[in-house]
């Protein structure tokens, strides 16, 4: 951009900054829009990033309902991609208790690596848990010794699927596991028996944008009647930084929804059917960092939220009991809950229907949520149970649940600063 163009853009940029500040001050004093009078729902658990590396990245799991590991029955099992650890959560006397199940850093004999980067958990039809190693493409399962020790075992070690980020069952009594290869393939294999053969369900590599490690084929969900109708759903990123939700019967695709992304990361993309028969879709805040566009607290955008869709027809429709149906403020009626940074992954307890979400944090904290209709889970006013420490420190020290006009204006001002290069480039 020429110097005179930059100079011309500066006054307009300043105008935008001032406008947003005054919008935050006056509009939010009414208490009717995002950022004012927040009623944030606490995560059931949060944990701090590794003290040495400063990183962490939660991978949501399942409430264990299988029979092979009695010690974990009824506990929520989840892991961390960066730390390579697996934990369990259990409600005891009204408080959640977190226990380390397995530390792959301390047990490197399984792969020879420093850790297993746990990219996904999967559940068989009988309720047994598997998890994937994105780096080696191998699959592992949980088991229990006669003495009660929970162990991790390699599952069919001759099967290796590169960049594996998802494990699913089809609910069709076939006892197969389906594995997502991030570049755009879905493979299946039998759980029982000695066969290491894999079958290709879908190959859309030529349609998928997977340049960034958070892009690619991201989600898979089988129609509750898949055994009879062969219908399944996927999410994947396409060129132009767009997340697409599609319905498939064989190779025949019907595009249901496309969400433009301002950046390549924080697409979310995990999908699952709930016990109510509706499809739930997890969406990240659109990326970069600090929720650069304030998407997660803005009910007028789908980003940073969990959607609930009726996909029984040729196009999707909105269930009549979604929490924002019929609102007068142009809030997106597809939204079931909001205030998420990058939900990865979520599941329903097959016994009581509770919806558990692992939401990936940024600076210090990862969190586990039990999600309810209409709930606000706090990002980017809060990370885990803590007030989010903005690098600009405009609103440090304020109560996360009592964001006033000045504070919200500063919050929005920060977002303009974060996106200033984008704005100038656009101008």
Language-model regions: role of each:
Residues 176-202:
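Beta-propeller domains
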Residues 49-53, 110-113, 155-160, 202-206, ...:
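Surface loop/turn motifs at the tips and blade-to-blade linkers of beta-strand repeat domains
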Residues 195-222:
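Blade-loop segments of beta-propeller domains
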Residues 1-25:
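Secretory targeting signatures
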Residues 244-273:
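Asp-box/WD-like beta-propeller blade repeats and closely related beta-sheet repeat scaffolds
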Residues 62, 122, 165-168, 221, ...:
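Conserved beta-strand position repeated across blades of beta-propeller domains
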């Amino acid at each position: 951009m020429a110097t005179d163009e930059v100079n011309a853009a500066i006054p307009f940029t300043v105008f935008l900054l001032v406008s947003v500040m005054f919008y935050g001050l006056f509009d939010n004093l009414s208490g009717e829009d995002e950022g004012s009078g927040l009623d944030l729902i606490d995560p059931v658990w949060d944990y701090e990033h590794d003290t040495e590396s400063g990183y962490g990245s939660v991978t949501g799991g399942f409430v264990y309902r299988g029979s092979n590991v009695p010690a974990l029955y009824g506990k929520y099992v989840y892991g961390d991609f960066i730390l390579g650890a697996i934990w369990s959560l259990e409600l005891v006397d009204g408080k959640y208790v977190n226990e380390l199940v397995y530390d792959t850093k301390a047990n490197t004999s399984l792969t020879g690596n420093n850790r297993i980067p746990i990219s996904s958990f999967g559940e068989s039809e009988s309720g047994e848990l598997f998890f994937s190693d994105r780096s080696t493409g191998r699959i592992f399962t949980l088991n229990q010794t006669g003495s009660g020790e929970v162990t991790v075992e390699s599952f069919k070690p001759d099967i290796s699927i590169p960049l594996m980020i998802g494990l699913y069952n089809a609910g069709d009594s076939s006892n197969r596991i389906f594995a997502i290869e991030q570049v755009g393939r879905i493979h299946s294999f039998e759980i029982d028996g000695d066969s290491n053969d894999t079958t290709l369900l879908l190959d859309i590599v030529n349609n998928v944008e997977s340049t960034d490690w958070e892009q690619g084929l991201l989600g898979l969900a089988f129609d509750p009647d898949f055994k009879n109708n062969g219908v399944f759903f996927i999410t994947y990123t396409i060129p132009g930084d767009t997340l697409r939700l599609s319905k498939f019967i064989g190779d025949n695709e019907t595009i249901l929804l496309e969400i433009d992304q301002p950046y390549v990361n924080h697409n979310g993309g995990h999908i699952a059917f709930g016990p109510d028969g509706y499809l739930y879709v997890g969406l990240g805040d659109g990326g970069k960092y600090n929720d650069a566009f304030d998407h997660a607290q803005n009910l007028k955008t789908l980003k940073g939220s969990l959607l609930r869709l009726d996909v029984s027809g040729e196009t999707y429709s909105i269930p009549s009991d979604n929490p924002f149906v019929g609102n007068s403020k142009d809030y997106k009626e597809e939204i079931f809950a909001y205030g998420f940074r990058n939900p990865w992954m979520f599941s329903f307890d097959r016994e009581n229907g509770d919806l558990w979400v692992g939401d990936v944090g940024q600076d210090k904290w990862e969190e586990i949520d039990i999600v309810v209709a209409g709930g606000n889970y706090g990002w980017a006013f809060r990370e885990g149970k803590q007030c989010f420490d903005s690098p600009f420190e405009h609103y440090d020290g304020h109560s996360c649940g009592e964001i006033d006009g000045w504070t919200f204006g500063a919050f929005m001002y920060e977002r303009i600063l974060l996106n200033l290069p984008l704005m100038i480039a656009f101008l």
